[in-house]
Amino acid sequence: MAAGDNKLQALQQALNSIEKAFGKGSIMRLGEASAKLLVEVIPTGSIALDMALGIGGVPRGRIVEVYGPESSGKTTVALHIIAEAQKMGGMAAFIDAEHALDPVYARNLGVDIDNLLVSQPDTGEQALEICEALVRSGAIDVVVIDSVAALVPKAEIDGEMGDAHVGLQARLMSQALRKLTGVVSKSKTCCLFINQIREKVGVMFGNPETTPGGRALKFYSSVRLEVRKVDTLKQGSDMIGSRTRVKVVKNKVAPPFKVADFDIMYGEGISREGSLVDLAVDMGIVEKSGAWYSYKGDRLGQGRENVKEFLRNHPALAAEIESMIRGRTESARLAAAAAPAAGDGE
């Protein structure tokens, strides 16, 4: 026992000296009240995607990567996250390295463009320094970088068109992420990188697709979302939107590999009503018999599009159904978080 007491005393002295040197909270036991067990989140604007992420949205204080082919809905998802952060009273920033942000579309998605900070940097270094400065301020809830592929190193911009710049962008991203990760964690900012897709040459077997910017972002990201368009939504002969599938290919805060399907309507963004209909049917909240949908014995309409329109015209009913879906999801999430703790106590 004496040897055990000596060890504990030595450990406590070490902890005290660490806290004296680096400040209180620099080292702690994981289960202490000061160490948050439930991750703080920002909703994505799609209840289906919130459920697929397992925690109700994208995590604060973490790095998130959203990637996919062109016109798949990557920027739309990012703008919805910004809109949700603003609805919660937060501040958001959009670093537009592609110089392609459409303010009218952003407003249609619910973004308060008068209070959205926007930067259109000249070089990759400038973009990442602006990002770091915003995160260090501690006043930003979400910062979006669109996109990694457009973060051009200064040496490449200053050089000639045909010059080879092997690995410059990868080195830039690796250095920036080493600096950013700790700052992002302390500030509770969600740092969201949008990325494109490239194809590796000469791949015979397996997936030839990769993302630009080296491997650093893959490692440092707590969540990676793959966004793909799977179908086109039509009304008669008119194309009115696209059916989008998001796969959670990496998740450090919940079980990964879950998939969310939702509608993105052209000019409007993610269809809230479409996700409500799909999830309510899956959970048994709304009954589907043939083409008819009913809720608590009352018919909502015939056909999915008609039910979406009905919910759009009856926001109180839509809010009630959403509350039931989120309530069940949150109960399951809290039960999953409490299960290991209950097991430890036995």
Curated annotation (Swiss-Prot):
Query: Which protein family is named in the record?
Result: Belongs to the RecA family.
Molecular function terms in GO for this entry?
Answer: ATP binding; ATP hydrolysis activity; ATP-dependent DNA damage sensor activity; damaged DNA binding; single-stranded DNA binding
| Pfam families found in the cross-reference section | RecA, RecA_C
Q: Which residues form a coiled coil?
A: none
The protein in question is named Protein RecA
Q: Which PANTHER family match?
A: MITOCHONDRIAL DNA REPAIR PROTEIN RECA HOMOLOG-RELATED, RECA
Q: Which residues bind ATP?
A: G68, P69, E70, S71, S72, G73, K74, T75
PROSITE patterns the record matches: RECA_1, RECA_2, RECA_3
Can you say where in the cell this protein is located? Cytoplasm
- What is the protein's major site of localization? cytoplasm
Look up the domain of life of the source. Answer: Bacteria
Q: Name one GO biological process term.
A: SOS response
Q: Name one GO cellular component term.
A: cytosol
Keywords tagged on the record: ATP-binding, Cytoplasm, DNA damage, DNA recombination, DNA repair, DNA-binding, Nucleotide-binding, SOS response
Function, in words: Can catalyze the hydrolysis of ATP in the presence of single-stranded DNA, the ATP-dependent uptake of single-stranded DNA by duplex DNA, and the ATP-dependent hybridization of homologous single-stranded DNAs. It interacts with LexA causing its activation and leading to its autocatalytic cleavage.
Protein's UniProt keywords contain Ribonucleoprotein: no
